[in-house]
């Protein structure tokens, strides 16, 4: 139950304050801490997993398991499992421990590995079997029981990483995320997944060699359907058993940290799966979902939306975030489908939704939940980042909550992604008519702290793979991909790339089979593309101009944004060191331009330091090997001019160099571009 109050013209949703005294006589011989329960029912217990669910413990000198469940409108609840032949027995009946819906029981002599569920009798006389909402391990699908599991500790060896994480300013650091689906990255054979432990041997090495800074795992919470990719969750605290056990996942994360790779987890706090064993109508009535059917039912995805105003649901979800932060050492959460949470009319037609108390379409409870989530993580887990997948123009997503923002650290730039993909799908002949597709994103670039995403959503459902989206014949597709990627890495904002794009897989991603790694060995262009991505990733990571001032207006400057006739874009990326900058020349047509003049800000010697048209990458080899000397003369509103060669469908990057004990004239005499 909640109260809505208006204070200082701001809406505040506050839980009804529950008097602590209410619990004191009902705490089963003081097994439960009254403050924990109080905070749980206030929506402010962020470690509820420490007492909810199943916990091995000793009571009255007996070793066993304490089970605790929230089911406020259940009539009776029994624990059933293979220990009881799945029969309800009076000695396994849970006790109601307070009038707000908590139930609990201690059962001695239970062992790890026992399968169990809750048999919940509803007020209407019907009964249903439910998995434990706080259960930390489950049967492999299609089976659905929870499995008793001791708190699984491993010997962590990532202290150095965690200390570094806490001290890092991620806004001024390189972030280059490799998004992957563990079940289809690599497999043993057609039908067998690699386990967490097997992945810990190969994945960290691969990601480090490729030059990525982070991985982002698609959801690893337990889910019944492989084809949902993990986004329709039944067990929020249960790490999916498809790939092994809890310790295995911890060892995988530990191995990634030891290789200086951060771990971001895709997380779905907005809606949940309708399967009977899950949270849906948990006690026979709307429990985790909204009471109002229109508000609960997510018709677009066939799921139910969480009631983000219920205190116990808030405790459940925010505790779930901290469960993975504290127990698994994850470094960030990518929050899925934030738009679905923010808008009452998201995915609904006119007449299918009811406005909020102010007449608007904003979900006020969800806004408050998101703010509390981000505030809690910033307060208690310094260095852990949160990322919003938010597809609308909702303002201040990455602004601090104290200034009216939602409090996320980063937001996916879906507008940039849509515009740039549309541009690169065009025949180069027509690109001059759509020149603003690549310039417009800079108009709003500093409104949020953006991540530029090329995610799994862009390479499925008939959208084509990334390489196949590119226009032209075989050669041009690869050259266009390289140019697009170099432009992306030069554009302000952190980076995210989905697995398989890094070697140009032509088929769309399919969750039921591994990536086509064989292409790298069989075909030169795929091997060269793979090497290109490795070089591009490391070029990005090793040059602070490409990330240090991502969110500072001084970090980017157009030299020429208006050359639509030739589809050429020229810009500068800068660092805090005013002497360091990189000049990007991006050509999105298959034309070569010789003796091409560009404006540069300073007199000096320049050198081409990266070129996507290198033969080693599969290009035509139109590169500049020597040094270049700028001459005085205005060009592109810059005081000096540099004459270069512009390679076809490619990006070339230049920097100004200074060599000790050599004059610029001497350098020029020694080197010329070819």
UniProtKB/Swiss-Prot annotation:
Gene Ontology BP term (one): glycogen biosynthetic process
Record pathway: Glycan biosynthesis; glycogen biosynthesis
Active site: 336 (nucleophile), 389 (proton donor)
Pfam family, one: CBM_48
Reaction catalysed by this enzyme: Transfers a segment of a (1->4)-alpha-D-glucan chain to a primary hydroxy group in a similar glucan chain
Domain of life: Bacteria
UniProt KW Metal-binding keyword: no
A GO term, aspect molecular function: 1,4-alpha-glucan branching enzyme activity
Any one Gene Ontology cellular component term annotated for this protein: cytosol
Keyword Nucleotide-binding: no
Keywords: Carbohydrate metabolism, Glycogen biosynthesis, Glycogen metabolism, Glycosyltransferase, Transferase
SUPFAM superfamilies associated with the record: (Trans)glycosidases, E set domains, Glycosyl hydrolase domain
EC id: 2.4.1.18
Gene3D superfamilies named among the record's database cross-references: Glycosidases, Golgi alpha-mannosidase II, Immunoglobulins
Broad enzyme group: transferase
CDD domains the record matches: AmyAc_Glg_BE, E_set_GBE_prok_N
Functional summary from the UniProt entry: Catalyzes the formation of the alpha-1,6-glucosidic linkages in glycogen by scission of a 1,4-alpha-linked oligosaccharide from growing alpha-1,4-glucan chains and the subsequent attachment of the oligosaccharide to the alpha-1,6 position.
NCBIfam families: branching_enzym, PRK05402.1, PRK12313.1
Summary of subunit composition and partner proteins: Monomer.
Family, as annotated: Belongs to the glycosyl hydrolase 13 family. GlgB subfamily.
Protein's name according to its UniProt entry: 1,4-alpha-glucan branching enzyme GlgB 1
